[in-house]
From Swiss-Prot:
GO biological process, one term: aerobic respiration
Entry's cofactor comment: Binds 2 [4Fe-4S] clusters per subunit.
Residues that hold [4Fe-4S] cluster 2 according to the record: C61, C90, C93, C96
Topology in the lipid bilayer: Peripheral membrane protein
Source organism of the structure: Rhodopseudomonas palustris (strain BisB5)
Stated role: NDH-1 shuttles electrons from NADH, via FMN and iron-sulfur (Fe-S) centers, to quinones in the respiratory chain. The immediate electron acceptor for the enzyme in this species is believed to be ubiquinone. Couples the redox reaction to proton translocation (for every two electrons transferred, four hydrogen ions are translocated across the cytoplasmic membrane), and thus conserves the redox energy in a proton gradient.
Subunit structure: NDH-1 is composed of 14 different subunits. Subunits NuoA, H, J, K, L, M, N constitute the membrane sector of the complex.
Main location: membrane
Keywords: 4Fe-4S, Cell inner membrane, Cell membrane, Iron, Iron-sulfur, Membrane, Metal-binding, NAD, Quinone, Repeat, Translocase, Ubiquinone
Pfam families associated with the record: Fer4_7 (PF12838)
Subcellular location: Cell inner membrane
Domain of life (superkingdom): Bacteria
Family note: Belongs to the complex I 23 kDa subunit family.
Listed name of the protein: NADH-quinone oxidoreductase subunit I 1
Amino acid sequence: MIGWLEAMLRVGRKLFVKAETQLYPEEKPKLYPRSRGRIVLTRDPDGQERCVACNLCAVVCPVGCIDLTKAVADDGRWYPEHFRINFARCIFCGFCEEACPTSAIQLTPDFELGEWRRDALVYEKHDLLISGEGKVRGYRYWSVAGKAIDGKDKGEAEHESPPVDLRGLLP
């Protein structure tokens, strides 16, 4: 009988305390700076796509929700002909962002991806591309890469030494 009375007193005391429930759509939750949400593809400061279709993001993805195909532009740059992410399968782990050597793929704090149909959660390249540079400002991959493109040969990138002539090293 005393145990029952103690339990009722505990419940009675909590009865008049204000609840800590957040009313989600009206009150937005506090998001931390490193929170991981929707994936976007960013652009160079010049306005060109940063993605070089190296396929590292698709390889490192634990659920295999990224699909892309590489193409080569006239000036020698690589770009993704198609880039597709299935957000119905994505677990927002951030491995793709860490693996990207060009900082093209980035996770934003936007997490509201509710849809009525699953096929609406498959985003194509035109859905993922944003107009800005994202979190990494002023980075131009092709100006620091050791790959030859139109207007830049190997060894002419920023902070790059000229290539070594291996035949000149032979005795």
